[in-house]
Amino acid sequence: MPALNRLLLLSNSRNAGQGYLEHARDAFRDFLGTEVSRVLFIPYAGIRISHDDYAASARAAFEAAGYGLDAVHDAEDAGRAVDEAEAIAVGGGNTFHLLKTMAEQGLLPRIRARVEAGMPYIGWSAGANVACPTICTTNDMPISEPPSFEALGLIPFQINPHYTDAHPPGHQGETRSDRIAEFCTVNPAVPVAGLPEGTWVRVEGDRLSYVGHAPARVFRGTEAPVDVEPGDGLQFLMDGGR
């Protein structure tokens, strides 16, 4: 992957008992530092919330961390806003609708180029999904049809956010692990990292660290899943998955 990529990819936006993005406030400060003063927010994954209301929630969270926030839907030229942004934050919601809207506005190649040149990228849930090669490991229903499942490709592996393998007694449907295993059976060369809520990955160039309170679960081909504790144990995902 390009050596300048800087990514902070979160599983979720809210932990139980905490405010919106409160659990990531210190991570935002550590990641963005003092070189960034404002971030550009992309609210297109929001479905049952207006872009304005979504941006207001994100703005309050980033201001609490010490950063201003501008929303891409308020810009006269969304592409130019991306080109001039100091950092980008992509919110969660429906991944299919997010990717469709980003594609329609021509933002995918512009975001990719900026991130590969060193612009910080923050994404949570759907915003983490679109940083992957494809959106094929999202948990969302396909309520909108993007032109392709191909996404930004900022990392060489897939993420499944909100990962849990809970299986209520008596429930006969597939578990999350079952669904991810289906993806890996069809795409054996592409590893998937299941990120429990309250966790995230941080990418600095070709280095990756995993932060949180619980192990990530990694799926590869038909191999048995492997749990990886927080730290640098997921680095192999940046090194070809082995």
Regions found by a protein language model. Name each.
Residues 8-9, 87-91, 122, 159:
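Structural motif
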Residues 13, 47, 93-96, 127, ...:
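Short glycine-rich anion-binding loops that position phosphate/pyrophosphate groups of nucleotides
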Residues 104-118:
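Catalytic-core regions built around general acid/base machinery
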Residues 83-84, 117, 154:
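Alpha-helix C-terminal capping/helix-to-coil transition sites in glycosyltransferase folds
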Residues 40-103:
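Portal/gating segments that form or line small-molecule/metal binding sites
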Residues 89-92, 114-134:
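Catalytic nucleophile loop
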